[in-house]
Amino acid sequence: MKAYERLLNYVVVRTPSDENSETVPSSACQFDLARLLEAEMKELGLTDVILDDQCYLYGKLPATEGLEDKPAIGFIAHMDTVSDFCDHDIKPIVTENYDGGELRLGTSDTILSPKNFPHLTDLKGRTLITSDGTTVLGADDKAGIAEIMTMIERIQEEKIPHGPLCVAFTPDEEIGTGASHFNVEQFGADYGYTLDGDTEGEIQYENFNACKADFVIKGFNVHPGSSKDTMINASLVAMEINNALPSMETPRGTEDYEGFYHLMSMSGEVAEAELHYIVRDHDKDLFEAKKKTLKLIEKDMNEKWGEGTVALTISEQYRNMAEIIATCMHLIDNAKKACENADVAPLVLPIRGGTDGCQLSFKGLPCPNLGTGGHAYHGPYEHITVEGMDKSVDVVTELVKLYAM
């Protein structure tokens, strides 16, 4: 079976994670895909297949005889999809020989256009997979799952010599907790790769340092007709806080290694208001400087409006795994070589986000990220090509060969 055929089977299984849930997994529906994958892993000849009660799925492919002493290499992808855009009733559409221009998705008003996604012109002539424009596609990260499964199948069918291989599929990556309950010892790999990137050939090992920053503003509400010098409008204070941040240090104004403050949500009345940010930077010192800026704003606002008006809570999320990967750069060197062997241009890029591999690297499993061939995740424009998926399978297959040498 080809990777895209598996993807088409997987995306119709609904698996949104829920950031407001206190359970693990955050949504019971993730077990629906996990059980399907559990059965498929067993059919493919994986051993020690275990689906635990927190929806982590593990399996192993024992080494070819004589290669048992080679490093155990793991491959990881996540089962959940985002819940911040419609994920109900996903209807994938396959467009053969895409012309590289504007494409209406199904009967929706959603137009996939090179004006917004210039790389589309490079996909001319390929077979393009999209949703019908009303939902996400779910290639993030079911494409990664499909490619890992297809690689395992190919190794078995073609009897490709290999060292010990480990496979895991995780829940809740999209809400930042995918690695929280990952059992590294159970997994059994010395090194790992997540397949959770974009363009085929992507190699990523420098991710953001990340935290959440939550402001709660307490106002003082009196009748507006008699409030001179007494009213404190919490919503206006919230506006002051946001205006105190560097105006260009937002996702829209930054790229590559540049960090940002991102206002995720806000709410407010006169009496109380809230601002919820995520803060990101690749550079550790610049990241710390951003947190100091937030604390200084809190201090300034309380000096202006009265102590206790503004309360800031900063919650750490994840760190840049580059410091861990720097100790085992063979992971990157071999990934580059695997791309070249698969006739794919290696693209070493910073991750403007995070993956399960970020946290796993700090739990003792160095784990850079590889591309799957997908684009424009987390919305109705999400798309991937059959050819990109095939090449991603080629890359991980070549990786397996390199670690068996």
What are these regions (language model features)?
Residues T121-F208, M248-G268, E272-H282, E288, ...:
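Acidic/histidine-rich catalytic neighborhood of metal-dependent amide-processing enzymes
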Residues E22-K70, G74-I76, D80, K91:
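A non-catalytic alpha/beta surface segment that caps or lines the substrate-entry region
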Residues L67-P161, A189:
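Active-site metal-coordination/substrate-binding segment of hydrolases
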Residues T194-S227, M231-V237:
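Phosphate/diphosphate-binding glycine-rich loops and adjacent basic-rich segments that engage nucleotide
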Residues T121-T135, K218-V222, A342, G374-H378:
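Glycine/charged-rich beta-loop-alpha catalytic/anionic-binding loops adjacent to active sites
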Residues K2-A28, T130, Y318, H378-G379:
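N-terminal capping segment at the start of a domain
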Residues S235-M405:
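Metal-dependent amide/peptide-bond hydrolase catalytic core
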Residues E68-D69, H223, K284-A289:
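Short, conserved charged micro-motifs
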